[in-house]
C-alpha cells in the first residue's frame, strides 16, 4: 500500500495564500450612520432699514427659531428641529430720544428657551417679572420663580453704551475736538452647544403659534434708559430631525 506525500512546493504555495478580510459589521454600521445623518442647515434673520429692531426701555422679545415648513435650506423639512449654534452680529445705535443726554448704561441680551409657548410670544416682564422700579436696570433681572419651569436662560451677555449730549450730525467748533463715546457699538457673539429641540404643529408657517414645544427667543434690554436701535443679523445653525 503506497502513501502519497505532500511536496515542498505545495507547502510553499499554501503558505503564500492570502486570505481576504471581511469588513466588520461595526464598520459598516458606522459608515451607514454617517450617511444617514441630516445635514446642518442655516437660517439668517436680517434686521436693517424698515426691519431694524427698536429696543425700548423694558426691553424687547423676539422669536428667532422661525423655521417655516419647506424645501429650502432655511426651512424645516420635518416635524422636529434641533438648533445647535447661533451667530449674532449687530450695530447698536443710540436713538434720538437718548442722544440729548449725557448717560451710560449696561444693556443685556439673552437667549431664552420656552418649553411651552402657548401660541404667543411673552414680554420681557413676563419672563423676568421685574418690578417697574427696576425697569431701567436689566442686569438685575432674574427669571420669575413661578415660571422657572417654563423659561430657561441659555445665554446672557452684557454690553455698555454711552451718550454725551450730542447727536451724530453735530459738528465741533474749529478750535475744539470731541472725544468719541460709545453711542454706536458693534455687538458680536457666537455660541454653540445650545441643543434646542423644537416640536412643530402640523402647519406650514414658522411663527410662535406653530410651535408645540421649544421656542427660542432673543431678548434685548437697554440699561439706564439708554434706548437704541439694532441693525444686523442673526444666523441660526439647525437640523431637521424626526418624522416627516
UniProtKB/Swiss-Prot annotation:
Encapsidates the viral genome into characteristic twinned ('geminate') particles. Binds the genomic viral ssDNA and shuttles it into and out of the cell nucleus. Plays a role in protection of the genome from degradation, virus acquisition and transmission by insect vectors, infectivity, and systemic movement. The CP of monopartite geminiviruses is absolutely essential for virus movement. InterPro entries: Gemcoat_MSV, GV_A/BR1_coat, Viral_coat. Its main location: virion. It is found in: Virion; Host nucleus. Signal peptide: none annotated. Keywords: Capsid protein, DNA-binding, Host nucleus, T=1 icosahedral capsid protein, Viral penetration into host nucleus, Virion, Virus entry into host cell. Belongs to the geminiviridae capsid protein family. This is Capsid protein. It holds the Pfam family Gemini_coat. Residues 1-39 are annotated as: Disordered. GO terms for biological process: symbiont entry into host cell; viral penetration into host nucleus. GO terms for molecular function: DNA binding; structural molecule activity. Homomultimer. Interacts with the movement protein. Binds to single-stranded and double-stranded viral DNA. It comes from Maize streak virus genotype A (isolate Kenya). GO terms for cellular component: host cell; host cell nucleus; T=1 icosahedral viral capsid. A motif (Bipartite nuclear localization signal) lies at residues 1-24. It comes from the Viruses.
Amino acid at each position: 500500500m503506497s502513501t502519497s506525500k505532500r511536496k515542498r512546493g505545495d507547502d510553499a504555495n499554501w503558505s503564500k495564500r492570502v486570505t481576504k478580510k471581511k469588513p466588520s459589521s461595526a464598520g459598516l454600521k458606522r459608515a451607514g450612520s454617517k450617511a444617514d445623518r441630516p445635514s446642518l442647515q442655516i437660517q439668517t434673520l436680517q434686521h436693517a432699514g424698515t426691519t431694524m429692531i427698536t429696543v425700548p426701555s423694558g426691553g424687547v422679545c423676539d422669536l428667532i427659531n422661525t423655521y417655516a415648513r419647506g424645501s429650502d435650506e432655511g426651512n424645516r423639512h420635518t416635524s422636529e428641529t434641533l438648533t445647535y449654534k447661533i451667530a449674532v452680529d449687530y450695530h447698536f445705535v443710540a436713538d434720538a430720544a437718548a442722544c440729548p443726554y449725557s448717560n451710560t448704561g449696561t444693556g443685556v441680551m439673552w437667549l431664552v428657551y420656552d418649553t411651552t409657548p402657548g401660541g404667543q410670544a411673552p414680554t420681557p416682564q413676563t419672563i423676568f417679572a421685574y418690578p417697574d422700579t427696576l425697569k431701567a436696570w436689566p442686569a438685575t433681572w432674574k427669571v420669575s420663580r413661578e415660571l422657572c419651569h417654563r423659561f430657561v436662560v441659555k445665554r446672557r451677555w452684557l454690553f455698555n453704551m454711552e451718550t454725551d449730549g450730542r447727536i451724530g450730525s453735530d459738528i465741533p467748533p474749529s478750535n475744539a475736538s470731541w472725544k468719541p463715546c460709545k453711542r454706536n457699538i458693534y455687538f458680536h457673539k457666537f455660541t454653540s452647544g445650545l441643543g434646542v429641540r423644537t416640536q412643530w404643529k402640523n402647519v406650514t408657517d414658522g411663527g410662535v403659534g406653530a410651535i408645540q414645544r421649544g421656542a427660542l427667543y432673543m431678548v434685548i434690554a437697554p440699561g439706564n434708559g439708554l434706548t437704541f436701535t439694532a441693525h444686523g443679523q442673526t444666523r441660526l445653525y439647525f437640523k431637521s430631525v424626526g418624522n416627516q
